[in-house]
């Protein structure tokens, strides 16, 4: 059937890492979601610290940050030639904001955006017809601070995600304990300075002081959003409706006060949520989701390698892969679809300082 043919299509795993330009900072593997096996295909050198990336919908372009401090920070456009199994750098542009740590494509794929951690800003890049980054960019800067005297002295933009209805952009700000919300308009024509995001109608959602908002994900039913907070180690559950997030629940993912929570994802069937914790008791907290109410119940945890900054769940929900930065490895866990619990398959991929995993087809 056509459906099973789609599933037979090659599944690629893209890996971003902390790397010098002399190393292959981005690598591509084949991943077989039927058996959890992977095979290295290709890589690309020349980018400093491509620590976060996003593929285009067709998988033929990859956009990656160059997470450096200050002026040397970049956004990078890469061509992925699946026939030749080759990655080629199309072009790079400065972000004008230090330490970009997250990158995303607008729903129409006319723009790429970076969240700049040290810059406390968001950069908007229009794309040309070949998917290259144009040089005329828009920088949106923020102000403020919060409770933690070491980590919240200024804005720290950590994640930017478009809402599933494509009408808003949510930007988590670890430094000010806020989510900035921007109405989105893809077809604005009066120059790049007004493109995509409506700054005049921006509003903010405050979370508890000292939380440290990091990554956001949406439930497949689009009714709920979940935020992992790096400093408090809590997940916040929100109901979502037309740009408005209303708090449902705060629940601990990090139970040892490590202040290093990382990433958050939901299984494709919408039944389980996973959140990673670093610095102490490195691992993944597992929650079941009440899909009517949006509430979470802690159902288990899984120890991982060191510093699980980022992880991903295969499309069929069978495998959860964890980028363990300081173990220099990607662990492959099998996921029990009934209990949500994880089991290490031992099919570990050895690679230097992996910190971002994405699938494309």
Enumerate the predicted regions with their spans.
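Short, small-residue-biased leader/transition segments that mark boundaries at the very start
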Residues: 1-7
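Short loop/turn segments immediately following the C-termini of beta-strands
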Residues: 18-20, 67-69, 117, 127, ...
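Short loop/turn segments immediately following beta-strands, especially the blade-tip
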Residues: 30-36, 78-85, 125-134, 183-196, ...
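Blade-loop segments of beta-propeller domains
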Residues: 40-109
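A short beta-strand motif characteristic of beta-propeller blades
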Residues: 39-45, 88-93, 144-150, 200-206, ...
